Amino acid sequence: MLEADLVSKMLRAVLQSHKNGIALPRLQGEYRSLTGDWIPFKQLGYPTLEAYLRSVPAVVRIETSRSGEVTCYAVACTETARIAQLVARQRSSKRKTGRQVNCQMRVKKTMPFFLEGKPKATLRQPGFSSDFSVSKKPNSTLLRNKGISLGVKSDAEVLPYTLQTTIGNEVFKDVPVQSHMTMSTNNRFSPKASLPPRFQMHLSRTCTKEMSDNLNQAVEKPNVTPPASYTYKMDEVQNRIKEILNKHSNGIWISKLPHFYKELYKEELNQGILQQFEHWPHICTVEKPCSGGQDLLLYPAKRKQLLRSELNTEKVPPSPLPAPKQIPPLKGCPAVMPGDFKEKVAELLVKYSSGLWASALPKTFEDMYKVKLPEDALKNLDLLSDVCTVDYISGNPQKAILYAKLPSPADKILKDAEQAHGNYDIKSTVEQEYLQIEENIAESTDTFMETVTIPPLIIPTETSPSVLVVELSNTNEVVIRYVGKDYSAAQELMEDEMKEYYSKNSKVTPVQTVQIGQLLAVNAEEDAWLRAQVISMEEGKIKVCYVDYGFSENVEKSKAYRLNPKFCSLSFQATKCKLAGLEVLSDDPDLVKVVESLTCGKIFAVEILEKTDIPLVVLYDTSGEDDININATCLKAICDKSLEVHLQVDAMYTNVRVTNICSDGTLYCQVPCKGLNKLNDLLHKIEEYFHCKHMTSEYFVSLPFCGKVCLFHCKGKWLRVEITNVHSSRALDVQFLDAGTVTSVKVSELREIPPRFLQEMISVPPQAIKCCLADLPQSIGMWTPDAVLWLRDSVLNCSDCSIKVTKVDETRGIAHIYLFTPKNFPDPHRSINRQITNADLWKHQKDVFLSAISSGASSPNTKSANTPILGNTGETFRKSLTDVLKKSVVNHPSSFFTKELPPPVHLSKPGEHMDVYVPVACHPGYFVIQPWQEIHKLEVLMEEMILYYSVSEERHVAVEKDQVYAAKVENKWHRVLLKGILTNGLVSVYELDYGKHELVNMRKVQPLADMFRKLPFQAVTAQLAGVKCNQWSEEASMVFRNHVEKKPLVALVQTVIENTNPWDRKVVVYLVDTSLPDTDIWIHDFMSEYLVELSKVN
């Protein structure tokens, strides 16, 4: 029986290591990374993980955010109070070296408007023979027709595919291998009663809690740290790799090395080590075959590899090892003699363990040996049967595959023993030579070090990489370090090797003389060894800059050593960036101080706008519930405080203008003050400036980004707006800083603030004050459209209202007020607060959205709580965004009432393939595909819908089930099918272009205009062919989802099931991932293998 106390103690320890808590989907992965086991909630008698966590409130505190994310926090006890205090202080502003970078930071990604898939041109098109049978499983060998084609035996076993594994935000890719090859059954599956690590790694990426009813809900990828088994002593691993290579003197594919490693030592080989072999010349020789693939060949370390340096060859001691035999290229490439032919073919095939097409043999033979293959060699392949296995495909000699003949067990034992004995004899010699070379390197002059070239730092290609802000002197030169596998993780690995090298190598001594600019290895604090560059020199001390951390320090000469060239292959990790939107104030001391206090020593997600030498970026703090734009926050923090409006409690203010009313009753007001007067003066000057100056392209916004402040022209004057959401290169959302209004506009309608006014304009704080009516009865509850309409008609854009402040809630940034119209001031009994409570406006009908409206009143612009309600003036300026869209509303008055449906989307015929994108994947029995060729048209339609519905007048809709509408979901308008009506004002909709089920407020549902009914609905439900399973487990669904969701794939159509409703059509397809350069991954093969593994475990 499991000890519940032990589990709870381990759980508390895991939670205490994360002071900001752990999201519930990531908890299992974090627990397993530290303990090696999953949380056994089922064995403890609980149906779900959450149920178990709620049963131990003394250990776990569970909180649910507004977005619905469940986060777990540790509850400290007396025994662990000291630990809790240390964890609370673990992030300090002090500069530290070594392991101070949190590589596991979660980045909240929003749904991109443009898909993050590869363009269609990069998807390889699989070619299939004309006699293809739908019922027959397609042969993967037919997918490839380039380079060296690798074949498959008719009875070949299916090997596990090489797939990418995600740990936290970092993607580790195994070196791809051919997906099919011959292998004994004994070696195919692990005999252990557990899933293979690659399956476990994929499962650890997502939560193990019970499936949500909404299967389309995005599952956040957890930040799983590598398990303890991946922590190796480097020398032990290197010795083991030497032993493996000594047993395979003819070479071994790097992708096969983890398999042999596990077979011999019963441990997993860290995939990160595979990237280091090119830097270990004393361990192995790395060779890239001429086939053009990414797989590499490894050989035992040879003298030839050791001599590859810029040292004078005279300094290298002579070696007893014979030089490798080289075949010089001959003019005309004469044919090889028959006596040597078979031997060379056998030697060649050893390098292609997955087989080689016979048709590819002549070219491969010539590339390797620089001689031509005999012309009649392929006419009778049976002559090669003594040196290789010939496998004919469909009886066609041209389709034969050649395999190297495996030695018999007895021969293999003798050969391995002989090879091991031979390698043992030369092992000490090789190691002595390598140590001698290292000693010569250490003793080399400073001139040698000047020839070392450090590769430049490559900007990450991922959408939102993480960075650690180190320091800054101005906002145009902020020192940062990228966080990730090829950056901070690679640096940590290198520093471990540096510590190992300099701590244990007694022959390495401190430098005696140094030069400015010279690279050194410095023994810094906490016994860390860091790379540094000399800045200046004093007696006994050197001022160095730590090139991977970006700050400088004076160090003793006794702590400085010459940097070994093997530590020069990694780029300097400290680099600089420029904060977008702050360029004009980059040297302002107040701004620099604010930026430094908010950013230094912290990790942020970064949006890279321009990839230049000093990239232009926007920083986001994603540690809380909402992403915080650091650039915009710093800009607002340096506003002129004397221009802000400070409302006083019980004070009366006159000539107040109500600029915006939201559907929850929130108001935005402008109060006369010094800041408002200066703003109006600046806007008037800008109006005159643009009137006198010709509008050139420099004033158009060429690079929109969130947080950018610019100008928008409406009702004959310029107004300040801040970009809040960029939908695409054409459409975006803006907020009017001085009115509180939010709307969608075209990028082409925005203008840059002229440079001469920019600094003054930024100094003026936003003039829209957020208010709410005070002392409204609690029984009112949700505002009805009628109440919002009455309030709008009463006060919106009235410039001479008055307010009395009763309370200022600084935490929420809202003031509670009594509002008066000019006729009723200052009688409190005739205030708007009293009138609206007495009015018959709060009668919630069975469906408040179908309430009767008098013929004299226009339809109210009712939106959600955070969406503005605009009066006549607001409507006018919104409709002035674009004349084209305005005309489209007038010219299509009947478009709201049509029920015409677009034609069904075109699908390939059975037996044909098509490029698809998978936006949603629940399990192999249900996922959604989109035709890749139509995605661009869908993006254009989405842009047009955003602009159209932002200027069109909202209507009360008598919604009906199973009808098509337009609905606003997460700031975007979608074509939806209404699936159900709930009693709480929400409706269930199905996105016809993306295949997702969503719940939205009925106020966000509008008629679908006729112009948006032309493009076929893009979402097609699909089922995976080639696998049979009545019910897919949660774990299997996760594995499938991680391999196909949000990815462009090639689909081979097996069956198309037609239906009169386009959203009820279904297609049965094979899915193929062609993203890897030399391997096609058939998803049904992978899932079949997974089911076999799962059945063995169960």
From Swiss-Prot:
SMART domains: TUDOR (SM00333). Residues 861-1098 are annotated as: Interaction with CDK17. Disulfide bonds: none annotated. GO terms for biological process: lens fiber cell differentiation; lens morphogenesis in camera-type eye; P granule organization; piRNA processing; post-transcriptional regulation of gene expression; spermatogenesis. It is found in: Cytoplasm. Keywords: Cytoplasm, Differentiation, Phosphoprotein, Repeat, RNA-binding, Spermatogenesis. Residues 513-570, 703-760 form the Tudor domain. GO terms for molecular function: mRNA binding. Belongs to the TDRD7 family. Component of specific cytoplasmic RNA granules involved in post-transcriptional regulation of specific genes: probably acts by binding to specific mRNAs and regulating their translation. Required for lens transparency during lens development, by regulating translation of genes such as CRYBB3 and HSPB1 in the developing lens. Also required during spermatogenesis. Found in a mRNP complex, at least composed of TDRD1, TDRD6, TDRD7 and DDX4. Found in a complex containing CABLES1, CDK16 and CDK17. Interacts with CABLES1, CDK17 and PIWIL1. This is Tudor domain-containing protein 7. The lineage of its organism: Eukaryota, Metazoa, Chordata, Craniata, Vertebrata.
